From Swiss-Prot:
The gene is trmD. The keyword Signal does not apply. This is tRNA (guanine-N(1)-)-methyltransferase. Specifically methylates guanosine-37 in various tRNAs. It comes from the Bacteria. Its EC number is 2.1.1.228. S-adenosyl-L-methionine binds at residues 117, 137-142. Homodimer. GO terms for molecular function: tRNA (guanine(37)-N1)-methyltransferase activity. One of its GO terms (biological process) is tRNA N1-guanine methylation. GO terms for cellular component: cytosol.
Length: 248
């Protein structure tokens, strides 16, 4: 999986490329992150990438040409590597809310380019001419698109076969089956008078599977009822699931 990231702060991405699961995935060439600074595509001595907004108002607006020239550089790099360019994604508060399903969709693209906005906004003409999709991580505003881009890349990289130590880890994450994850426990067996549930200590696999499913249903019902409704609409709930939910 290849990511191309347009950012004024490429140094930020060392947190993703050098550490943890995502860092190992990059080391093993399961994923690659290519960083592109629009200032490198500016011809003026000051490397100007922003200007005042027409019509007035606070803040500066990222200019069209440096961004378009950067995108042209990305596409030229793809052509030289013999790969087809994937979608261009702008990180923006008005974008579609990122989800596990979108992470799975992105993985299927093979490559994706992120545009990390800064300042007040990105010139709309760049958006109209170049952007295929806009994504957000929530109804709040950050200083730029770098943190959302890293969060999304982390979610996608986890899905790459071989990226996780345990092949089942990703499939058992929250949201993969439409529900929240079940509780997890490790040693010691008793801590401050709090014990690990007996069913997890008995070694009966079928009972453990049932307990985990019920706990997943219970947590989702209490914390994210909207996910229960969505799972029901998609046919992800069994008759036994529905019977258990009625008992809550």
């Amino acid at each position: 999986m290849r990511f191309d990231v347009v950012t004024l702060f490429p140094e930020m991405f060392s947190a993703l490329t050098q550490w943890g699961i995502t860092g190992r995935a990059c080391e093993q060439f399961l994923a690659s992150v290519h960083l592109w600074n629009p200032r490198d595509f500016c011809s003026d001595p000051r490397k100007t990438v922003d200007d005042r907004a027409y019509g007035g108002g606070p803040g500066m607006v990222m200019m069209v040409k440096p961004l378009e020239d950067t995108v042209a550089g990305i596409r030229a790099s793809h052509e030289a590597a013999g790969i087809k360019s994937g979608p261009i994604c702008l990180l923006a508060p008005q974008g579609e809310r990122f989800s596990q399903k979108i992470a799975t969709d992105i993985l299927s693209y093979g490559n994706l380019s992120f545009i990390c906005g800064r300042y007040e906004a990105v010139d709309q003409r760049f958006v109209d001419r170049n952007v295929d999709l806009q994504l957000s991580i929530g109804d709040f505003v950050l200083s730029g698109g770098e943190i959302p881009a890293m969060a999304m890349m982390d979610a996608v990289i986890r899905l790459i076969p071989g990226a996780l130590g345990d092949g089942q880890s990703a499939t058992q994450d929250s949201f993969m089956n439409g529900l929240l994850d079940y509780p997890h426990y490790t040693r010691p067996e008793i801590y401050e008078n709090l014990s690990v549930p007996d069913v997890l200590l008995g070694g009966h696999h079928a009972k453990i599977v049932d307990w985990r499913r019920q706990k997943s249903l219970e947590l989702t019902f209490r914390l994210r009822l909207d996910l229960i409704e969505s799972a029901r609409a998609k046919g992800l709930l069994t008759r036994e699931d529905e019977q258990f939910l009625r008992s809550l």
